[in-house]
Design a protein with these regions (language model features):
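Basic, glycine/lysine-rich polyanion-binding surfaces/domains
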Residues: 1-192
Length: 192
């Protein structure tokens, strides 16, 4: 089993009793599917349905908050975008990029861990507080990961994805869009 260090990614914690309902109105996938054992991907889009980011959403082990990760270059813009519509909702979004390491174990499918299909195969995400990582992982190099990503057909921000991309153009509707969940920013365009 190879491990991938995704710690450079932007990381956010979403808290408050309205966190699931609020985030569900901001992203293309059904946030109610998220659990401490399952991670989902979702698109953050403009009102015109164009991508503002592809994110991964999981739940912390205490089930008290949602954890989001995204491409590092989207750290500031996504923080602003995801916070933009908080008005009277009991929701707070915190940038925890510097507080956690994010490790993805390829080919791992332990039901007791946070399952994630980031690279089109079974895997597990581990959010680890900085300084708590235990040595011993068999790390995949950045070059090998990029080759693997391309072979698996996984789009990446700055390569196949940008702010002019509609989710369907990158086949993101296959696992990052739920057409039955209800309204979210950009939904009318994406559902056409």
């Amino acid at each position: 089993m190879k491990s991938v260090d995704l710690s450079k990614r932007a990381k956010f914690r979403v808290t408050g009793k309205d966190r699931v309902r609020y985030l569900n109105g901001q992203v293309s996938n059904d946030v109610r599917k998220v659990s401490s054992k399952e991670t989902i991907s979702a698109c953050v889009t403009t009102a015109k349905g164009k991508l503002e980011g592809l994110i991964w959403i999981s739940e912390d082990t205490s089930s008290e908050s949602l954890l989001i990760d995204a491409d590092p270059e989207l750290r500031e813009s996504l923080m602003m975008r995801l916070s933009k519509y908080i008005i009277s909702d009991d929701v707070e979004i915190f940038d925890v990029t510097e507080d956690y390491q994010l490790i993805h174990d390829l080919g791992h499918d332990d039901d007791n861990l946070m399952l994630s299909n980031r690279f089109c195969c079974n895997g597990v995400d581990r959010w680890i507080k900085v300084g708590d990582l235990i040595a011993g992982s068999d790390w995949m190099s950045d070059k090998s990961l990029e080759e693997y990503r391309i072979k698996q057909g996984v789009p990446a921000w700055g390569y196949e994805l940008n702010s002019n991309t509609l989710p369907q153009e990158a086949l993101l509707e296959r696992k990052s869009v739920d057409f039955h969940k209800g309204c979210y920013v950009g939904q009318e365009i994406i559902s056409r």
